[in-house]
């Protein structure tokens, strides 16, 4: 008798669920995926497509996207062999974890943090060690260092600025953790362009156990293009490259990246707008009774309300999509929403005043 299909699958799947965006991805006002509210201008898209038309479509791209990697290495000021480009930072995350984790390994994850870290680790049969954030959702660097030593972990992942809390770990604290740890340290800087803290990319020459993860989906407004990067000491990067899927990045992605980097003022202007709106929104939210605001170092804001899921559903009915993050540890009754255009932000504020406002 043949075995049940479930017996033939990775046993880790039994405790995992497929990734899902609650509420979907379509709405009149969409603020649930931390995207940029600004698309690329038409003239820049036309430049990209004109260049792409000249590329051979019947031939595979390079095994690795060397053009894109050289361009990004020059942009961030590191050697080209210190950079790896991927089909989105999530694909890079899978590659790094494949290179570094597996049975018998231990990973330390502060919680709450990006859910994909734990998911990939479980798939690779890696033991997960959690370190809770402090009550105000700030990182506990001392606890991370202490727990990493006690548990003899092999890998530490730090999302800073952190999704879903919106808070950062000071760059000096990141370095202190990397210096103290007998482990590889991955620093996910998906939201670094919005942060008050410095990037730690410059530290890879000094800290040989440091890996920095970057995405082009947030500040660079290229979520639809799927472009991510890892940056590390070249010797470490050579090992990370071994499980990398070949031919995973298209020529179109490389060309788009190069054109956006050549017109980076568009990114700078967009980030400036988002930061200004973040401050304005934060000020307005503080005046709404029944809403508790958390400090943000990202392009999104976290609020705590009395009944988060009911509010999430009511906003959805009113064609406004936000994210219910109540399922994360320490985040009961919390909602997350990214900064949109001013009129989108005003529409959200109006609904929050109608639905939440209570006497202070």
Swiss-Prot record:
E.C. numbers: 2.6.1.9
Gene Ontology terms: biological process: L-histidine biosynthetic process
The UniProt record lists the keyword 4Fe-4S: no
Modified residues (N6-(pyridoxal phosphate)lysine): 218
CDD domains the UniProt entry points to: AAT_like
Cofactors named for this entry: pyridoxal 5'-phosphate
UniProt keyword annotations, A-Z: Amino-acid biosynthesis, Aminotransferase, Histidine biosynthesis, Pyridoxal phosphate, Transferase
UniProt GO molecular function: histidinol-phosphate transaminase activity; pyridoxal phosphate binding
Cited Pfam families: Aminotran_1_2 (PF00155)
Pathway annotation from the record: Amino-acid biosynthesis; L-histidine biosynthesis; L-histidine from 5-phospho-alpha-D-ribose 1-diphosphate: step 7/9
Catalytic activity: L-histidinol phosphate + 2-oxoglutarate = 3-(imidazol-4-yl)-2-oxopropyl phosphate + L-glutamate
Keyword NADP belongs to the record: no
Top-level class of the enzyme under EC nomenclature: transferase
Subunit structure: Homodimer.
PANTHER family (alphabetical): HISTIDINOL-PHOSPHATE AMINOTRANSFERASE (PTHR42885:SF2), HISTIDINOL-PHOSPHATE AMINOTRANSFERASE-RELATED (PTHR42885)
Protein name: Histidinol-phosphate aminotransferase
């Amino acid at each position: 008798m043949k075995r049940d299909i479930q017996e033939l699958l990775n046993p880790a799947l039994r405790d995992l669920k497929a990734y899902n965006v609650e509420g979907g991805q379509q709405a009149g006002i969409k603020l649930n995926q931390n995207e940029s509210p600004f698309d690329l201008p038409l003239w820049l898209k036309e430049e990209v497509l004109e260049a792409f038309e000249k590329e051979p479509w019947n031939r595979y791209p390079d095994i690795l996207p060397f053009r894109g990697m050289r361009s990004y290495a020059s942009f961030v000021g590191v050697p080209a062999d210190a950079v790896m480009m991927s089909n989105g930072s999530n694909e890079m995350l899978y590659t790094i974890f494949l290179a570094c984790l597996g049975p018998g390994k231990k990973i330390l994850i502060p919680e709450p943090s990006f859910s994909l870290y734990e998911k990939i680790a479980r798939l690779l049969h890696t033991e997960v060690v959690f370190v809770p954030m402090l009550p105000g959702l700030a990182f506990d660097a001392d606890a991370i260092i202490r727990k990493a030593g006690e548990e003899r972990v092999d890998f530490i992942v730090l999302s800073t600025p952190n999704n879903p809390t919106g808070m950062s770990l000071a760059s000096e604290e990141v370095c202190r953790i990397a210096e103290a740890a007998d482990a590889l340290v991955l620093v996910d800087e998906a939201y670094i362009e919005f942060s008050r803290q410095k990037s730690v990319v410059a530290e890879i020459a000094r800290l040989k156990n440091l890996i920095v993860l970057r995405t082009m989906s947030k500040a660079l407004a290229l979520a639809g293009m799927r472009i991510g990067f890892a940056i590390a000491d070249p010797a470490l990067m050579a090992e990370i490259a071994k499980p990398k899927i070949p031919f995973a990045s298209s020529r179109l992605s490389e060309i788009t990246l190069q054109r956006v980097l050549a017109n980076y003022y568009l990114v700078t202007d967009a980030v400036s707008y988002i930061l200004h709106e973040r401050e304005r929104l934060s000020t307005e939210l503080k005046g709404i009774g029944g809403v508790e605001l958390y400090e943000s170092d990202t392009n999104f804001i976290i609020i705590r309300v009395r009944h988060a899921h009911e509010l999430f559903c009511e906003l959805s009915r009113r064609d406004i999509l936000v994210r219910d993050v109540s399922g994360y540890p320490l985040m009961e009754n919390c909602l997350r929403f990214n900064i949109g255009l001013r009129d989108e932000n005003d529409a959200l504020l109006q609904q929050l005043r109608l639905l939440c406002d209570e006497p202070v």
